[in-house]
Regions:
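A short acidic, glycine-rich active-site loop
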Residues: 54-65, 101-105, 177-181
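Short gly/ser/thr-rich secondary-structure transition/capping motifs
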Residues: 63, 137-141, 174-175
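Short, glycine/acidic-enriched loop or turn micro-motifs at the edges of active sites
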Residues: 14, 37, 87, 162-163
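Glycine/Thr-rich phosphate-binding loops of Rossmann-like dinucleotide-binding domains
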Residues: 17-18, 41, 89-91, 166
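His/Asp/Glu-enriched, well-ordered alpha-helical/loop segment
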Residues: 1-4, 53, 72-75, 79-81, ...
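C-terminal cap of metal-dependent C-N hydrolases
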Residues: 99, 152-181
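Histidine/acidic residue-rich metal-binding segments in metalloenzymes
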Residues: 1-81
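Short amphipathic alpha-helical segments
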Residues: 21-22, 93-95, 169-170
Length: 181
């Protein structure tokens, strides 16, 4: 606040962080923040399996934290969703839990997981799309070019009534390190 600068908080994973971000936004501090699909969709309960695909930084947190992240998005304290896409080779993720690197892939499952979790919490499909598009663009100061007849466009067609199951065959990344499959 003193410098009138801005700060972006990536990978928010705890209720305490959401509370602090909310507090400073109310004070007028130029703070933006993001959450990851895995932090709004998974909890520390997945860690009991010692599956290295669930080893991320920051780590998966409690159900209380997960619900606070969702509330933070819906109320506007959190600005966007970012995948934290972190592919690792099979050999790296087959190491024991302590020595395996942190990270999981996230691009292919990001929207499906986020949409499922957030629409159950009351968000619209349109709002979920905005958290992946307009939210990051606003943080970066980028203009989103409106859809206009005769002009180039970046679009995605989403039928939220179609059931989709994330499978290993959908993965186009360097590795398959995802707890979602």
């Amino acid at each position: 606040d003193y410098t009138r600068g801005r700060i972006h908080i990536p990978h928010v994973s705890t209720k305490r962080s959401v509370d602090l971000i909310r507090k400073y936004k109310k004070m007028g501090v130029n703070v933006t923040a993001e959450v990851t699909p895995h932090h709004i969709g998974l909890t520390e309960n997945k860690l009991t399996e010692y599956d290295t695909h669930t080893k991320v930084a920051p780590p998966l947190r409690s159900e209380l934290d997960r619900k606070a992240l969702i509330k933070g998005l819906i109320e506007g304290s959190i600005n966007c969703i970012a995948t934290d896409h972190a592919p690792h080779t099979i050999e790296e993720k087959e190491m024991d839990f302590i020595h395996s690197p942190c990270g999981m892939i996230g691009l292919e499952s990001a929207f499906g997981l986020s949409h499922t979790v957030l629409t159950k919490a009351g968000a619209s499909t349109e709002k979920v799309v905005q958290w992946f598009t307009k939210g990051p663009a606003d943080i970066m100061g980028w203009n989103i070019i409106p859809f206009q007849i005769g002009e180039p466009a970046e679009i995605a067609i989403i039928d939220s009534k179609i059931r989709w199951t994330f499978k290993k065959s959908h993965i186009q990344s360097k590795s398959k390190n995802s707890p979602m499959i």
